[in-house]
């Protein structure tokens, strides 16, 4: 293939990758028209899981599932992400502090990083990754995980959840399961 043809293909491939991975960045002349929108298969799967985990049905849920980490900066506000992330970090810290369990050596939350040191299983670290619009979990039980911020608008109320970018599992359920195992008592957020 000559250089001229290669240079013509590179922008088209870049546009195709950008459009399928980040639909909000798609130019107006791209693969979407006014009546349809482009959504990746993984974003579609996350949207379905988000609707399913909130108990939403088509009748009660607006078609407003926002997968922030796939949108680039479109629709993103620092306040919305930071508020949701800080609320979850503070909730985990408060609930663990309230348990007064011998299995917990120390729990602290500073600068968007929650550290939970256990006596026997190791350290859990949950931290904000604002540039990626994600929360990252380092677990001594299951290893590292990245969670995307998902919002679902249902009956006029917005609900935030955190879904794994790998397999779509829910962060809160993962924490409840693993902390119940480590602490030896039921842990609910």
Swiss-Prot record:
Q: Which reaction does it catalyse?
A: 4 Fe(2+) + O2 + 4 H(+) = 4 Fe(3+) + 2 H2O
Entry EC number(s):
1.16.3.1
Q: Name one GO molecular function term.
A: ferroxidase activity
Give, as one word, the top-level EC class.
oxidoreductase
Q: Name one Pfam family in it.
A: Frataxin_Cyay
- The transit peptide of this chain lies at 1-50
| UniProt subunit comment | Interacts with IscU; the interaction is direct.
| Listed name of the protein | Frataxin-like protein, mitochondrial
Native source organism of the sequence: Leishmania donovani
What lineage, starting at the top, does this entry show? Eukaryota, Discoba, Euglenozoa, Kinetoplastea, Metakinetoplastina
């Amino acid at each position: 293939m000559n250089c001229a043809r290669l240079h013509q293909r590179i922008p088209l491939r870049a546009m195709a990758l950008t459009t399928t991975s980040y639909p909000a960045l798609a130019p107006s002349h791209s693969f979407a028209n006014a009546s349809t929108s482009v959504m990746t298969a993984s974003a579609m799967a996350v949207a379905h899981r988000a609707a399913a985990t909130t108990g939403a049905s088509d009748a009660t849920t607006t078609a407003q599932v926002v997968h922030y980490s796939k949108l680039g900066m479109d629709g993103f506000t620092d306040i919305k992400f930071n508020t949701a992330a800080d609320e979850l970090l503070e909730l985990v810290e408060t609930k663990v502090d309230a348990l007064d369990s011998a299995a917990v050596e120390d729990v602290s939350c500073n600068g968007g990083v929650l550290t939970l040191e256990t006596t026997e299983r190791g350290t859990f670290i949950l931290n904000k990754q604002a540039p990626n619009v994600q929360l990252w979990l380092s677990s001594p039980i299951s290893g590292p995980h990245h969670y995307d911020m998902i919002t679902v608008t249902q009956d006029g109320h917005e609900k935030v959840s955190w879904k794994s970018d790998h397999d779509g599992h829910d962060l809160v359920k993962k924490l409840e399961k693993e902390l119940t195992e480590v602490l030896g008592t039921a842990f609910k957020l």
